[in-house]
Amino acid sequence: IHDWKTTRTVPGTDLPIWSTPWSTLRTLQQGTGPFMRLRDIVDQIPDDVVLAIDHKTTSSEDQRNTADLQAEERLFEYLDTAFGGHPERRVIWKIFAKGTSAARAKARGYRTMAMLYPAEVPAADLGSWDIIGMEWSASAEVWNRINASGRPTIAHIITNEGQARTALDKGASGLMASFPSRVHP
């Protein structure tokens, strides 16, 4: 579940994710299908699929809230159990430029992916992450800079085939899309 509330993803609703029972959330339909729990996804994906996962409260800022850090730790523990002690083979830890959870993920052996926006690139240490995400519509100058890092790049958030082509033409090595079947090159 991406957003804190269902407002954007399920029009006509306004349910807070943190306090709505799963018995209610599981009945809702987004544009891509029903809401799913991480464990349901993990149980269904083939062994060759790699997931990009972020812990929302610790991925976007320098988090110091004890409860949020404990929740992140529980997620790390779940992933360790779910993937037989080697989640780093199946999970990329996704963060944002100001997030500090990458260091904790790297200490556990995870590859990391930062989702950046053009204004963040000048101050970013592009060598800090294993994969760099950038808006598909960013300028050629921005794409040239992140491509020069030598890291794989992911264009976000792609909603149609034209955007996918534009991003790939700028050097993106991968695409992040809500509807992969609509944008697969």
Predicted regions and their residues:
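Structural detector of well-ordered beta-strand residues that form the stable sheet scaffold
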Residues: 52, 92-94, 113, 154
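Acidic (Asp/Glu)-rich catalytic clusters
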Residues: 40-51, 76-88, 102-109, 121-129, ...
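Alpha-helical scaffold elements lining the catalytic groove of polysaccharide deacetylases
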Residues: 65-76, 125, 131-136
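C-terminal active-site rim and adjoining tail of enzyme catalytic domains
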Residues: 113-185
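Aromatic/hydrophobic pocket-lining residues that form the small-molecule binding cavity
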Residues: 34, 38, 72-75, 160
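Solvent-exposed loop/turn segments at secondary-structure junctions
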Residues: 4-7, 49, 56-61, 97-100, ...
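An active-site metal/cofactor-coordinating segment within enzyme catalytic domains
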Residues: 1-50, 55-58, 62-65
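Boundary/entry segment of secreted carbohydrate-active catalytic domains
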Residues: 3, 111-113
